[in-house]
Amino acid sequence: GYSLEDAFRHPVYPALAFLTAPMNCPVEKINAAAFGEMLSRARQMFDYVFLDAPAGVDAGFRLTAQFADRFLVVTGAGPAAVRDAARVGELLELAGKTNAKLIVNRVDKDLLSTVRLTIDDVMDAAGLPLAGIVPEDPHVTLAASFGQSLLRYSPNCKAAKASRRIARRIQGFHEPIALR
C-alpha cells in the first residue's frame, strides 16, 4: 500500500505534496480504517489535505466523503453535470456533511447567455453555495500539454486568477466572485 512517505513533493512548489491513488487497486479493496488513519496523520503534517474523488457517487466518493470535513463539489454548467452535483450535495447532506460548496468549472459566459442560464441557476439546481467560478480558458490545456502548472505557465490568465481567488476563499479571505 501507499504511505505518506510515498507522497511526491512537487519540484517547483516544495510545500505541495501529492499522494496518488494506486492504479491497480480498486477502491472497494482499500481498508477504510487504514485510509482514515493515514488522513489523520496527513492532517498533522499539512495545512490542507484535498481528496480528489472520482466523478459520480460510487465507492470512491463514499470513501472520501466518509473522512472529509469540507467539500468542494466541482461541476460544469451543463444539465447532466449540474444534476450530478445536486445528487452529490443531497448525499452529503443525508450523511450529515453540511460544509459543501460549489465550484463551477470551464464556464463560457457567452454560451451561458445563449442558453439563458446564470450561475445562480446552477447554484439553485445544485443546491449548494458558490465557492468560485473558473472560466473556460485555453491556457489550462496548454499548461497541461507542456507539463506545467497553470500558475507558472500563464499566471495572469483568467483561469489562474480564478483559481487563486478560490484558494484565498478556502483560506478564509474575502474575495469577490465574478466571471471575468
Where is each model-derived feature located?
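Amphipathic alpha-helical transducer elements in NTP-driven molecular machines
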Residues: 1, 5, 32, 36, ...
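P-loop/Walker-type NTP enzyme "switch/lid" segment
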Residues: 1-44, 140-152
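Conserved catalytic-core segment of NTP-binding enzymes
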Residues: 33-136, 142
